[in-house]
Swiss-Prot record:
Glycans are attached at residues 99, 156, 180. Disulfide bonds join 322-326. Keywords: Aminopeptidase, Disulfide bond, Glycoprotein, Hydrolase, Metal-binding, Protease, Secreted, Signal, Zinc, Zymogen. The gene is LAP1. Residues 19-89 form a propeptide. This is Leucine aminopeptidase 1. Gene3D superfamilies: Zn peptidases. Binds 2 Zn(2+) ions per subunit. Transmembrane segments: none annotated. Monomer. GO terms for biological process: proteolysis.
Length: 389
C-alpha cells in the first residue's frame, strides 16, 4: 500500500541498477503451470491514464509514492457495471441503529488475539505474493480463518482460497444472510520490500498485517451474534484477505472482476489497510484518530462510517486523502461497488517504515488497532442488518 520511505540517492541508484533482480519461479499446485511474467505491464495511474512499464518500473513508481492499478489482465474491470453507481446507487442508513446489540459485542474484542496472530504473520521472511513465503503465509492465514469459523460453530459459514496464477491465494470467508445482498470487509495479506522484493525481508507488520489481524478479530466476535451465526441477518457478510495488493491491486481486481461478471450484489466494501501506527501523530501533538479517506470513495458509505466511528469508537475521525488506486477498495469501486477506506491516521502521519525491513510489531499500537476492530465489527453488524431497498 501507499507511501514509502524516501530512498537515499545511492540506494536508489543501487536498486535501479538491479533492473530485473533474479526471482525464483513459484511452483504452483499440481495441475497448474508455472506462472510466467510478461516483459511489461500495463498500469493505470489515474482514470484513463495508462502506461507500459517493466516490473522494475513498477517498483520504481512505488518508491516514488506513486500508486496504480496493474490492469495487464484486467482492462475490462468495471465495463459491465459502468452505470451501476449512477443508476443503482445504494442508500445507507441515516444513523447506526443497533447500539444495544453492538456495544456488548465490542467488549469481546481482544488485543491479545491480534498480537498473537500478528507475531506469527510477521515471522514469515516476506509475504511477497510471488514467493514461496507468500504462499505459505496465505496457507497459514487460511487455517486461522477456518479455525475461527470452526471455533464459533459457524456451520453455515464457509471459507475458501481464491487462487491466483502467481501462487499466493486470496481468501474469502462468507457468512450467509437471508439475501445475496453482500457487505465486504477487506484487508490485504501480502507484504513487500521495495528495495529487493524477492530477496529482502518484509515483515509487513503495519502494511498490512495490522489490517489482516484487525478484521480477523472482528470476524471472531461478529460470529458471537446469534443472528449472524444462524444466517437470519438480512444481508450476507464477507471477509476478504487480498493477495498481491502491492503489485497493483491484483488480487482484489481478480475477485471483483469475477463478482462483476457473476452479477454479485455488493452493497458496501470497507478496506482496512494499516491500522496500527500512531507515533507520528502523537509526535506532531495531534490527537489519536481514525483516518477516513475522502477521495475516490463512495460518499454515502463514507458518511455512514463517520457516524459509526462517532458512536462506537473511543477516538475521533479525521478526514484525509490517499490518491488514486491506493488500496484494494479501489478495485471494488472500479467494478461499480460502493467502497470506502480507513487508515490509522491523517495520511501525512501514516507509517513511513512500510515496504522495508523495519515494518515491525514494536512500532505499532494494539490499542489503536482495537479502535479499528471496533469500527470493523460495528459496521459489519450494522450493515448486515440494514434494510437495503
Amino acid at each position: 500500500m501507499k507511501s514509502s520511505v524516501l530512498l537515499s540517492l545511492c540506494t536508489a541508484a543501487l536498486v535501479a541498477g538491479a533492473a530485473h533482480p533474479l526471482e525464483p519461479q513459484v511452483v504452483l499446485k499440481d495441475g497448474q503451470s508455472t506462472f510466467t511474467e510478461p516483459d511489461e505491464y500495463l498500469i493505470e495511474l489515474s482514470p484513463g491514464e495508462t502506461r507500459w512499464v517493466t516490473e522494475e518500473g513498477k517498483w520504481e513508481l512505488r518508491r516514488q509514492n506513486i500508486n496504480f492499478f496493474d490492469i495487464t489482465h484486467h482492462e475490462d474491470l468495471g465495463t459491465i457495471n459502468a452505470n451501476r453507481l449512477i443508476e443503482k446507487s445504494v442508500k445507507f442508513p441515516s444513523k447506526p441503529a443497533f447500539n444495544k446489540t453492538v456495544v456488548p459485542l465490542l467488549k469481546k474484542l481482544k488485543k491479545d488475539n491480534m498480537r498473537k496472530h500478528l507475531e506469527t504473520f510477521t515471522s514469515f521472511h516476506t509475504r511477497y505474493y510471488k514467493s514461496q513465503y507468500g504462499a505459505q503465509s496465505s496457507a497459514w492465514l487460511l487455517e486461522q480463518v477456518s479455525k475461527t469459523l470452526s471455533d464459533a460453530g459457524a456451520v453455515n459459514a464457509s471459507v475458501k482460497a481464491f487462487p491466483h496464477p502467481w501462487g499466493q491465494s486470496s481468501i474469502i470467508a462468507t457468512l450467509p444472510g437471508k439475501s445475496n445482498k453482500t457487505v465486504v470487509i477487506g484487508a490485504h495479506q501480502d507484504s513487500i520490500n521495495l528495495f529487493l522484493p524477492s530477496i529482502l525481508a518484509a515483515p509487513g507488520a503495519d502494511d498490512d498485517g495490522s489490517g489482516t489481524v484487525t478484521i480477523l478479530e472482528a470476524l471472531r466476535v461478529l460470529l458471537k451474534s446469534e443472528g449472524i451465526l444462524d444466517g437470519s441477518a438480512p444481508n450476507t457478510v464477507e471477509f476478504h484477505w487480498y493477495s498481491a495488493e502491492e503489485g497493483g491491486l491484483l488480487g482484489s481486481q481478480a475477485i471483483f472482476q469475477s463478482y462483476e461478471k457473476e452479477g454479485r450484489d455488493v452493497k458496501a466494501m470497507l478496506q482496512q489497510d494499516m491500522t496500527g501506527y500512531v507515533q507520528k501523530t502523537l509526535d506532531a501533538g495531534e490527537p489519536e484518530s481514525v483516518g477516513v479517506i475522502t477521495d475516490f470513495v463512495d460518499p454515502g458509505l463514507t458518511e455512514f462510517i463517520k457516524q459509526i466511528i462517532t458512536v462506537y469508537c473511543d477516538i475521533p475521525f479525521i478526514l484525509t486523502k490517499c490518491g488514486y488506486a491506493c488500496s484494494d477498495h479501489a478495485s471494488a469501486s472500479k467494478a461499480g461497488y460502493p467502497s470506502a477506506f480507513v487508515i490509522e491516521s491523517d495520511f501525512k502521519y501514516s507509517d513511513s517504515k512500510i515496504h522495508t525491513t523495519e515494518d515491525k510489531i514494536e512500532y505499532l499500537s494494539f490499542d489503536h488497532m482495537l479502535q479499528h476492530a471496533k469500527l470493523t465489527l460495528a459496521l459489519a453488524y450494522e450493515l448486515a442488518f440494514a434494510e437495503f431497498k
